[in-house]
Structures are given as C-alpha cells and as structure tokens.
C-alpha cells in the first residue's frame, strides 16, 4: 500500500521541499527522492521473492531473519539486483531526513542527504534506520552501534522533524488503519531484549517506551489533521 502510494506520487509529478522517513519509510524516502516509481514497486513487492531476501537460513548465519546487508546495501550498486539512482537522489532539491537510533549513546540521530552522498554511506544509514532489534543485526556507523529509528522519541512517526524545521503543512503516510492502537511490549520480548542487548540498555528502553510514544504521536497527528495542518493517508485494514 505505501509503495503504491509513493509510486503514484512520483507518477503524478508531485514533490515536496522536505521528506522525512524512518524504518521502512527510509527506503520510501530514497525511492521517492530519486523519482524511481518502478524501484518503489520492486523494493516492496518483487524483492521478497529473492532467495537472498531473508529467512531462517540467513538468521542462523547471523545475517538476520531479513538479510539486511543484502536488502539495504548490496542491491543498490550498479551490479546489484535493484541499482539505485544516486545522481537523481542528490540532485533533488528536497531536504531529506532519515531517523536512526544510536544505541551506543541512547539517542536518536537524524541523517541528511549530504551525509548519504555515496552508496557506501547511504546503504548503512538506511539499513540502520530499518534494523529491527533481534530480527536484524545492529549496524556500525562511525564507531557507534545503530538500530531502528522507531526506538527514538517519536516512536516511529517522523513528522516531528519537519515541524521542528518550521513546516506547517504535512502529508503523512501511516502503515496502520486509522483506529489502530499499539499494544504494550510483551514481557517475553522484554526479557529477550535485555539478554540480546545487555550492552545497550537503551534498546530495551526504546522498545518499552515505543507504545506510549507511538500512540501519543498518532493522537497529535490526527489533531493536526483536524486543524488542517496534515493530510494523512491510512490503509483500510
């Protein structure tokens, strides 16, 4: 659903002065900014049929249940499965912001397009933003350990960044239905996180707090919508 929306926006020639993304949304950010509607489709539809995409075989090898290095780095190169148009991405005048979570420091970090000016730097950042704890191995960037940006203060709803930068009209794409409410983290997941990330307690804290942060973010977003400051897309189911 989200990939189809991104492809349609590109096909209609729609662009924005500021684009923020987190987790899977960071991949959408890249495809949208590079104006590649076909890659938007292929990344979220065809790629799952690739035997290198993931599975227990890759998980047992330490690559993650979703083979993150392949999905977010290897396929992007000219000889990869889905080459990325870096030149168009960089030429787009839009400001871009990708949310990640620095587990070493216990804080959110936003990366700009200027910090993703090569495929060697872009791939790890998008991978970090999308790295689901336990299911995917963490990413090292500049000596620090990174995981999914949804563990930050916005709970995975990155519309807070354009608001901080002064934007007052937003288009926001949500992946859950309008009436969705996130449930608290199960105790079993918490125990697993404490064990797997004992050296990074901020990961457990980020996941534990995400329910409240995410639900609060949705409430704020719908308030902005009521005030005419946000146009919100939600799936029917």
Describe each PLM feature range.
Residues 26-28:
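Active/ligand-binding-proximal structured segments within catalytic/core domains
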Residues 23:
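Catalytic nucleophile serine of serine hydrolases
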Residues 1-19, 30-237:
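Patatin-like phospholipase
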């Amino acid at each position: 659903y989200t990939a189809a929306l991104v492809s349609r926006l590109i096909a209609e020639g729609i662009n924005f002065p500021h684009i923020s993304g987190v987790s899977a949304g960071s991949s959408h950010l890249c495809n949208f900014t590079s104006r590649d509607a076909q890659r938007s489709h292929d990344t979220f539809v065809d790629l799952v049929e690739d035997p290198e995409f993931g599975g227990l075989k890759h998980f047992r090898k330490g690559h993650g249940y979703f083979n993150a290095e392949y999905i977010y780095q290897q396929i992007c190169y000219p000889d990869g499965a889905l080459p990325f148009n870096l030149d168009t991405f960089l030429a787009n005048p839009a400001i871009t912001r990708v949310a990640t979570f620095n587990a070493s420091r216990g804080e959110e970090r936003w990366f700009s397009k200027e910090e993703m000016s090569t495929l060697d730097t872009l791939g790890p950042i998008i991978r970090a933003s999308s790295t689901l704890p336990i299911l995917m191995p963490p990413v090292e960037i500049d000596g620090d350990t990174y995981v999914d940006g949804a563990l930050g203060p916005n709970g995975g709803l990155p519309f807070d960044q354009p608001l901080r930068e002064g934007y007052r009209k937003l288009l926001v794409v949500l992946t859950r239905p309008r009436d969705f409410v996130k449930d608290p983290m199960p105790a079993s997941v918490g125990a697993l996180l404490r064990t797997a990330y004992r050296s990074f307690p901020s990961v457990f804290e980020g996941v534990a707090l995400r329910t409240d942060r995410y639900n609060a973010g949705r409430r704020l977003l719908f308030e902005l919508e009521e005030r005419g400051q946000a146009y919100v897309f939600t799936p029917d189911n």
